[in-house]
Structure formats: C-alpha cells, structure tokens
Amino acid sequence: MTPQIDRYAVFGNPIGHSKSPFIHTLFARQTNQSLTYTAECAPVGGFIEAAKAFFADGGKGCNVTLPFKEDAYQFASRLTERAQLAGAVNTLKKLDDGEIIGDNTDGAGLVQDLLQHQVVLEGARILIIGAGGAARGVIKPLLDQKPTSLTITNRTFSKAEELAELFSVYGPVTAKEMNIVAEEFDIIINSTSASLSGELPAISSSVFAANSTSYDMMYGKGDTTFNQWAKQHGAAHAYDGLGMLVGQAAESFMLWRGLRPGAKQILRELRKNLEGQ
C-alpha cells in the first residue's frame, strides 16, 4: 500500500496570487520531504468550515493569509506566545493528539530577512509605519533584538497608542502622530499596503538617518513606491517584503517538518520567478 503523502495548504481570499505553493514545493525538494502544498480559496466568512474540512480530511498543516488570520486565531485550540501577542495566526499545525496549534511566523520572517541583509537591530532606532495586524505581528520579535527604541506611527493615532501600550512591557515602545514624526531613525519599516496602490504614507522624509535602512513589507518586480521614495530621501539600503515572505514560510516549514530549509537560495528562485512574470 502506498503511504499517504502529507498535505499542506494556504488559505486566503483571493489566493491566486500566492507564492506559498512555489516556496513550499522548493523547500520540500531542498529537504527531501514528500508532501503536497496547494492554494485554497475559502469563502469570506467560511474559513473555519474550510479549515475543519481540511484537517478532517487528513491535512497536516496550513498557512493562513488575508483575510483569515483572525479567524485562524479563533480556530486554533492552542496558541504559541507569539501568536497570542500578534492577535493573529498565519500557521496551523495538527498535533498527534488531534489539537490544532496556531502560530504566527511573520515577525520571525522579518527579523531573519533583516539579519540576512546584515541590518543591525541591536541598539537601532526603529520606526514602524502602520498599526494594523502586519505591524502587531512583528513588534515583539523586533524588541527581542534589543533596539534602543521602537516608535509606532499611524494615520489613526489611537491605534498606534494601543499597540505601544500593549507591547511596552517588552521594551522601549512609543507611539507618535504621523504629522509630528520628524527625528531620524536607523530602520524604517512600512507595514501598510500603500505601495500596492502607488501611494505613500503621510510621513516626513526627514526620518531617514545616514546609512538608514528602509523596509517595505509589500513587494513587486522592482522597487516599491515606498522604497523608491526612501532612496530619494537618504535611505542607504532598501528592501522589500519578499525575503520576509520566504522567512515566515521557512519558519512554518520548521514547525511542520522539524527541518529548517535554506531561505537564501529559494529567495533567489522566487525573485527570478517574479521578475520573469
């Protein structure tokens, strides 16, 4: 009898654009793991039913992307500390006892990518633009790297304040209104999706210190709108979120399979795939 191949998937809506099947197929090949990984479009409001069916049918684990990360948080029967702090889940795994554990690997993916680029996080002055789920998922992993300060700014200031209050117990976090942020930072992270529509956050260009790094969580063929602007205004280095995508995927793969794939080679392949489209 042929042993059943372990099944994994990514759930989202829309999901056609997802790079996750490409990434995990390469991870499996690289680590000699026998598995399948598919993209599944769940109806809005129907994620929990879709996830239940997936696991009941033998699914081993899945990634979760927009708009279902909060639903996945509710669905999990157990949560890791980083998932609890993020208030959202991007990785689910079925344990041997049948429980479903929820994790959030986004922050680990971001930190891995920054370190891969030799960005020094310890002692850095970090600015995060945006206070939504994407920002919330990365604050604790960034604070674990011991920056001098982490400032959150957002169009709706009260949201930035809420996040600063939530995470202040873990390190030096403050919230600042967008129109008064004018000091220099070493690392400026855009967690908003503004670049997707070619827009810029309403922030002063004076935030870029000498030798500063700009990081946009969005990605595309060339420089994102935000990174183009950052380079024009003094950022010495600019990176997009493709490496974070591969990093969070590697962390998910590690949770599922107990093996950490090499992200660097896969990122090269993915970049080539993206540029060729």
UniProtKB/Swiss-Prot annotation:
It catalyses: shikimate + NADP(+) = 3-dehydroshikimate + NADPH + H(+). InterPro entries: Aminoacid_DH-like_N_sf, NAD(P)-bd_dom_sf, SDH_C, Shikimate_DH, Shikimate_DH-bd_N, Shikimate_DH_fam, Shikm_DH/Glu-tRNA_Rdtase. Shikimate binds at residues 18-20, 65, 90, 106, 219. Its EC number is 1.1.1.25. The active site is at residue 69. Keywords: Amino-acid biosynthesis, Aromatic amino acid biosynthesis, NADP, Oxidoreductase. Involved in the biosynthesis of the chorismate, which leads to the biosynthesis of aromatic amino acids. Catalyzes the reversible NADPH linked reduction of 3-dehydroshikimate (DHSA) to yield shikimate (SA). Belongs to the shikimate dehydrogenase family. Homodimer. This is Shikimate dehydrogenase (NADP(+)). It comes from Vibrio parahaemolyticus serotype O3:K6 (strain RIMD 2210633).
